[in-house]
Curated annotation (Swiss-Prot):
Residue span(s) of domain Obg: 1-159
Family: Belongs to the TRAFAC class OBG-HflX-like GTPase superfamily. OBG GTPase family.
Entry protein name: GTPase Obg
E.C. number: 3.6.5.-
Purpose of the protein: An essential GTPase which binds GTP, GDP and possibly (p)ppGpp with moderate affinity, with high nucleotide exchange rates and a fairly low GTP hydrolysis rate. Plays a role in control of the cell cycle, stress response, ribosome biogenesis and in those bacteria that undergo differentiation, in morphogenesis control.
Entry annotated with the keyword Glycoprotein: no
Lineage: Bacteria, Pseudomonadati, Pseudomonadota, Betaproteobacteria, Nitrosomonadales
Species whose genome carries this gene: Nitrosomonas eutropha (strain DSM 101675 / C91 / Nm57)
Cofactor dependency: Mg(2+)
Enzyme class: hydrolase
Superkingdom assignment: Bacteria
Keywords tagged on the record: Cytoplasm, GTP-binding, Hydrolase, Magnesium, Metal-binding, Nucleotide-binding
One biological process term in Gene Ontology: ribosome biogenesis
Subunit: Monomer.
Residue ranges constituting the OBG-type G domain according to the UniProt record: 160-334
């Protein structure tokens, strides 16, 4: 299925039905009083978070939603029938904003969370409501109210505890395969990851967290180059970023230090808040280095990057160091409440 994470839709709630001016007409009662019923309520439009969905593609092809108007009132004090509501199912993590003003309408963070998008109009009043001691035969009635209508922007941002950050082919997809049940495509060419992948990392019984892998970043990503810029927003909800660095690139012209600095620069250009998010360095593919050089290479990278925070040397392919990494992440997240709980 094609991954769509941003669309524009239009929602039109139904108008309320009109009230009616009617009078009671029965045998032997030639001049009965008013009995005009009220109009029915117009249909409203709701959004409902559904954890079974993972894309907004349905709204790319069906962007307009119109609820029906309420029925008009009738005589004999009969009220018009209210119109059915429309419920739009959306993935958990969808942010809904007003397309014109940018104002936040809803942030669907919980499964089955239901939010009103456009309210249906109230039904009009029948002439029964206007009867008084001075007006025994009122002919007044009111029309139904108009339903609300809006242009909305739907933006899907994945809900994950940990985000993987790195250049194409740094080994992000291999890592998420190694520590979770996720099975993203892995190959020896750039951009094998074309959309975010989520994996549940289970450390112990009842202890787990969610990891997100996005397409790799390249220089110029903040200005729109490559694929990663489009998906950087998916890291905004994470508690921790893992900066994956390939310490043994096949291309000898690639300098891991320069590449790491370029990626951090792109991150800062894109979003200062994301740049300041807690971040650990993960030196991947250490198994490709001679054993007696591995520590020296890591030390050199730490000094060149002036890095004093946490770091790990791993091999996502062989699994070396991955268990220690996941336990460290779990311990870090457990200090930050709330974290993802396994169900």
């Amino acid at each position: 299925m094609k991954y769509i994470d941003e669309v524009k839709i239009q929602v039109f709630a139904g108008d309320g039905g009109n009230g009616v001016a009617s009078f009671r007409r029965e045998k032997f009662i030639p001049k009965g009083g008013p009995d005009g019923g009220d109009g029915g309520r117009g249909g409203s439009i709701y959004a409902l978070a559904d954890h079974n969905l993972n894309t907004l593609i349905d709204y790319r092809f069906t962007p307009v939603f119109r609820a029906k108007r309420g029925e008009n009132g009738r005589g004999s004090d009969c009220y018009g029938k209210g119109a059915e509501d429309i419920v739009l199912r959306m993935p958990v993590g969808t942010i809904i904003t007003d397309y014109m003003t940018g104002e936040l309408v809803a942030d669907l963070k919980q499964n089955q969370q239901k939010v009103l998008l456009a309210k249906g109009g109230k039904g009009g009043l029948g002439n029964l409501h206007f009867k008084s001691s001075t007006n025994r035969a009122p002919r007044q009635f009111t029309h139904g109210e108009a339903g609300e209508q809006f242009e909305l922007k739907l933006e899907l941002r994945v809900l994950a505890d940990v985000g993987l950050l790195g250049l194409p082919n740094a080994g992000k997809s291999t890592l998420i395969r190694a520590v979770s049940a996720a099975r993203p495509k892995v190959a020896d060419y750039p951009f094998t990851t074309l959309y975010p992948n989520l994996g549940v990392v289970r450390v112990d019984a009842g202890r787990s967290f969610i990891m997100a892998d996005i397409p790799g970043l390249i220089e110029g990503a903040a200005e729109g180059a490559g694929l990663g810029h489009r998906f950087l927003k998916h890291l905004s909800r994470t508690h921790l970023l893992l900066h994956i660095i390939d310490v043994a690139p096949f291309d000898e012209n690639i300098d891991p230090v320069q590449s790491a600095r370029a990626l951090v620069d792109e991150l800062r250009k894109f979003d200062e808040v994301l740049y300041r998010k807690p971040r650990w360095l993960i030196f991947n593919k250490v198994d490709l280095l001679p054993e007696d050089e591995q520590q020296a290479v890591c030390t050199h990278l730490l000094q060149a990057l002036d890095w004093e925070d946490r770091w790990f040397a791993i091999s996502a392919l062989t699994g070396r160091g991955c268990q220690a990494l996941t336990y460290a992440i779990m311990g870090y997240l457990e200090q930050l409440q709330p974290v993802t709980e396994e169900t």
